[in-house]
Swiss-Prot record:
Active site: 220 (proton acceptor)
Glycan attachment points: 59, 115, 118, 237, 805, 846, 954
Family membership noted in the UniProt record: Belongs to the peptidase M28 family.
Annotated compartments: Vacuole membrane
Protein name per the record: Vacuolar membrane protease
Pfam families: Peptidase_M28, PFF1_C, PFF1_TM
Organism from which the protein derives: Paracoccidioides brasiliensis (strain Pb18)
Vacuolar side: 46-390, 468-474, 530-533, 693-708, 758-992
EC number: 3.4.-.-
TM regions (residue ranges): 25-45, 391-411, 447-467, 475-495, 509-529, 534-554, 672-692, 709-729, 737-757
Length: 992
């Protein structure tokens, strides 16, 4: 007799069986492999090609040198360095155009240095406050590359000239930076990408079919002024599609932030390394993302259709002095450039008419109308894009078909008497005898585990929010590790305990059924949002549910391999009768403890492998007391055939542990099919969305936003990521869960006690200095979160001995603290004039009131600046800027009136002439947007402030207070601007 026959409990190892070792090993490998790929996609930027492998017409070495030159200093609109950058860009553009002109086959190129356009508008479309007026003068640089199919005439030179033929393509980047950042990614990489696009499309063989407009806009950082004033240039009537290149982080991959429609998004598929998700765009729709880009002007004002591509992380370097070339790399530059080349090449080569049909809004270009889209990348190598309507239709179909298929399958199982799910027992014909099936075991196990693990994860989110709320700022992956490890350990522990006391072969089927129900509800919610609000962010729930449905269906189909319940019950009853007969014939009746464990009180089999002596050649094949129906065919009903010991051995080897004895015919390999159907797609899509969310939001705490939303996202996405493990986790060995328990303990301690900021992940604190020119006093204000703001102020020498005046900040948990600081030197005084004494002469203004009317003319000029503003204690009804254009597409004023007018000019120390009227549209007395009472505007008086701004921070000693803060602030603090100006000086005025 063979060894296997000699010992019935010896099992041949099956590497794919649903047993602990294969389940633990294969599941761990699958999860690790896909998770690592997702992480690599997010953390590793594709390498830039060598010079030899670069596309024809692209020079990355030149692009990197351009970026280094561009970021040599701060260059906000209101700085001398900004003029230098403007001149340098013109020089670089002219050099590239000359080189292309020298070569044969190059296209015509026209360069417009726009020093004529200006615009007055209200910022109601950007900010929540609708009553801030803006006057802005353009210093944009516009480059037009004529396409081979464009109108050959210079139509822009004619009075009221309009382009003929198909619309062109606009690619935009802004060359101004903030006053506290060098602008390497915001938006230096976009600017040098435009220079390389100019070189690429003027290279022989790369001539565009449709015209290409490259807009180097100036003034984006201050209310998107550069893009708005572009609307006054003739080229704004020519372009129908656009690609906006932005930077809201400081490196990594350039992300497709949002798009207007499906049709234009399809051109992004041409990108060599696509990266992004529709989730970000829906964040803007839902108001979760407050900042804006030029995208809203090109689409909302001009009616163009296009894409917004931006760097998104790390935000701790955004708008700080670490947004420089040293803290980014050529790989990130290449990623943005390759995206720009691929997308733009597709747009300028398109021959269809999708972007040239008429629109219902006559104030916008005829770019046609698109459809809402769904899009996401896969490992940064492939890109999926389709219509939201398609997703809606598929979702509705699947919501109906999924339950219907399972229902029909359940009916078929019931008809064939194999529906063990929800079956407690089986009656034997008309007799009162019943056989226990134990089919309800494991029914409520999965919802209990899901609830407990999720509640614990959310509890940890609350704990972090209370104890160390900003740890995610620098330790995002420590938080992820804590959430994931505790979820898996708790789920494993609960599943193992449940399996120990109530083992069930139906654990997988019940788990998938519950996950099916939960994901069905998720898909219903996602589908409703998609249909009613056009929100596509729940796209992953469709694929999640589809995979869960297939995996659940496999579990239901498995049940067809089981014996009929009636057949199993009859065989169990026969065995009981034979056992009773055999036992009564014995001389000694064994005690209850000696009865075989597979005989239950009602005659059903209990499973298990009780200790017994090994059979010998003289042992009966019936094995005495352990009879079985293993020899009977599952399709038989009444036939009884002699079975062999070999069948008995196969049966014993097929039943796992103490699970139901009827389960021995279940396939042992289908769990792998279910794992591969569900786990990879869930990890890829859910993991991508989870990482995108937490990466974008991990550092929102420095902006005053509660970080609980980040921890909650980690908790919920942990559940979504590892819910596919629930059908298998009870089979895991203890090694992986115990290891994860140790990781949880370590990361929990770290997350609770570690300092949340570091030199690599600094806390942003916002600076402004305000000077009262009437009495010469000044105050330095820092805005940030407590207690770290106080720690920073305590390190500043000029604040020593003073009590900082702290008030609630402009948003969320931000606090603003002020003290008397070092006086600024933004205006060079005449020798012998001590500028620390007031009054200063930095601002000149004159106010003339029209006799008999509530109208006045205010003339304002500031020294060494080109940015000022008028702030009124009560809103004025209307205003006009001398020489300004007004565009009816952009709101000029509002019914609430205008409480502030911001003035920007391309000329240094310019004089603005502003006419205001506070009579034609009076504002209700005693009302203000902040809820504070103001003076009765029915009076014929108007009071307010004349303020000028200084933003040039390139020379040490000009703003000593800022130099001091940077020098003495802790290494984990980054200084960013609090407003348009670093220094604001003001005079009070009253018009009587």
């Amino acid at each position: 007799m063979s060894p296997a026959m000699a010992n019935p409990r010896v099992r041949k190892f099956n590497p794919i069986a649903f047993t602990p070792l294969p389940v633990t090993f294969i599941t761990t490998i699958v999860y690790l492999a896909v998770l690592i790929l997702v992480l690599v996609t997010y953390l590793v930027v594709p390498p830039a090609p060598t010079l030899e492998m670069s596309p024809k017409g692209v020079n990355l070495t030149e692009a990197w040198r351009d970026l280094q030159h561009l970021t040599e200093g701060f260059h906000p609109y209101n700085s001398r360095r900004n003029d230098d950058v403007h001149a340098w860009l013109l020089h670089r553009i002219e050099a590239i155009v000359r080189e292309s002109a020298a070569a044969d086959g190059g296209p015509e190129v026209f360069v417009f240095d726009d020093n004529l356009s200006n615009l007055t508008y209200s910022n109601g479309g950007v900010s929540k406050s609708p009553i801030v007026g803006v006057y802005f003068e353009s210093t944009n640089i516009i480059v037009y590359i004529r396409g081979s199919e464009d109108d050959p005439q210079n139509w822009w030179e004619w009075s009221n000239g309009k382009p003929k033929g198909k619309g062109g393509v606009l690619v935009n980047a802004h060359y101004d930076s903030v006053s506290t950042g060098y602008g390497a990614t915001d938006d230096g990489m976009g600017v040098v990408s435009l220079l390389q696009l100019l070189r690429y499309f003027t290279t022989a063989g790369n001539k565009p079919r449709k015209g290409l407009v490259l807009l180097f806009n100036n003034g984006e950082e201050d209310y998107l002024n550069g893009a708005r004033v572009y609307s006054q240039h003739a080229m704004s009537n020519f372009t129908h599609t656009f690609l906006n290149l932005e930077g809201a982080g400081a490196g990594g991959r350039a992300c497709l932030f949002r798009s207007t429609d499906t049709e234009v998004t399809r051109f992004y598929k041409n990108a060599k390394h696509p990266f992004g998700s529709v989730l970000a765009g829906d964040g803007f729709k839902l108001g979760l993302i407050r900042s804006q880009t030029d995208y809203v002007v090109f689409n909302g004002v001009l009616g163009l259709r296009g894409l917004d591509v931006s760097f998104i992380a790390p935000r701790s370097r955004y708008h700080t002095d670490q947004d420089d070339a040293r803290h980014t790399n050529v790989d990130s530059l290449w990623h943005m450039l390759s995206v720009a080349i691929g997308t733009t090449e597709g747009l300028v080569s398109y021959t269809g008419t999708d972007f040239d049909s008429k629109t219902t809004d006559q104030d916008k270009v005829n770019s046609g109308g698109g459809t809402l889209g769904v899009w996401f990348d896969i490992f940064g190598s492939a890109f999926a894009v389709f219509r939201l309507h398609t997703l809606f239709a598929l979702s509705v179909t699947l919501l109906v078909i999924g339950p219907l298929v399972l229902f029909i399958t359940s009916i078929a199982l019931s008809k064939t008497d194999r529906m063990y799910l929800f079956s407690m027992s089986k009656s034997l014909g008309g007799a009162s005898e019943t056989v226990s099936l134990r089919g309800l075991r494991g029914l409520f196990r999965t919802p209990i585990i899901l609830t407990v693990t999720t509640v614990i994860s959310i509890g940890l989110a609350y704990l972090l929010e209370k104890i160390n709320p900003y740890i995610v700022h620098s330790s995002q992956f420590a938080v992820w590790s804590m959430m994931l490890s505790v979820w898996i350990f708790v789920a494993w522990f609960l599943a193992r305990v449940a399996d120990f006391f109530r083992p069930s072969a139906l654990h997988r089927a019940y788990s998938y059924t519950w996950i099916f129900i939960v994901t069905w509800i998720m898909l219903v919610i996602s589908t409703v949002y998609a249909n009613q609000k056009g929100i596509a962010a729940g796209y992953f729930t469709f694929f999640y549910f589809a995979a869960v449905f297939l995996a659940t269906w496999v579990s239901y189909l498995e049940l067809f391999s089981l014996p009929r319940k009636g057949y199993y019950a009859r065989q169990a009853s026969r065995r009981q009768r034979r056992r009773s007969s055999s036992l009564s014939s014995r001389l000694l009746t064994p005690s209850a403890d000696e009865l075989p464990s597979d005989i239950g009180p009602n005659g059903a089999e209990n499973v298990g492998d009780p200790d017994e002596t090994d059979p010998t050649e003289s042992t009966s094949l019936l094995r005495g007391q352990r009879t079985t129906f293993a020899n009977y065919r599952t399709g038989g009903d009444d036939g009884v055939t002699e079975y062999t010991a070999e069948d008995e051995h196969v049966r014993e080897a097929s039943i796992f542990g103490h699970e139901q004895s009827w389960s021995w015919t279940l396939p042992r390999w289908t769990w792998i099919l279910q794992l591969l159907l569900l786990a990879p797609i869930v990890i890829i899509l859910v993991g991508q969305v989870g990482l995108l969310l937490t990466t974008a939001m991990s550092q929102i705490g420095s902006d005053g936003v509660s970080t609980f939303i980040v921890y909650l996202a980690c908790a919920l996405f942990s559940t979504l990521l590892f819910a596919p493990l629930l059908p298998f986790i009870h089979r895991f060995t203890y090694h992986v869960p115990i290891f994860l328990l140790l990781i949880f303990i370590g990361t929990l301690i770290y997350n609770l006690v570690a300092f949340p900021f570091s030199p690599a992940n600094r806390l942003k604190i916002f600076f402004i200095q305000e000077v009262n020119l009437d009495d010469g006093t000044n105050k330095v204000s820092l805005t940030g979160i407590q207690p770290y703001l106080t720690d920073t102020i305590n390190a500043i020498p000029s604040a020593a001995g003073q009590t900082a005046n702290c008030t609630q900040g402009p948003f969320g948990s931000l606090v603003r603290c002020s003290w008397s600081g070092l006086p600024p030197r933004v205006v060079k005084e005449d020798p012998g004039n001590d500028q620390t004494m007031g009054p200063y002469t930095w601002i000149s203004y004159n106010i003339t009131r029209t006799v008999g009317k509530n109208e006045a003319r205010i003339k304002v000029s500031g020294r060494n600046t080109r940015a000022c503003k008028l702030k009124f204690d009560n809103p004025v009804a209307d205003y006009r800027i001398s020489g300004s254009a007004v565009d009816h597409r952009l709101p000029h004023t509002s019914r609430q009136g205008v409480e502030e007018i911001r003035l920007w000019t391309r000329t240094w120390e310019n004089t603005w002439v502003v006419d205001v009227d506070w009579h034609s549209n009076p504002v209700n007395p005693g009302e203000s947007k902040d809820g504070d009472e103001k003076q009765d505007v029915s009076k014929n008086e108007l009071s307010g402030k004349v303020i000028c701004l200084w933003s040039d921070n390139n020379e040490s000693g000009v703003i000593p207070a800022l130099d001091e803060v940077r020098l003495y602030a802790p290494a984990w603090v980054a200084i960013s601007k609090s407003a348009d100006g670093l220094v604001e000086a003001s005079h009070d005025f009253i018009i009587q």
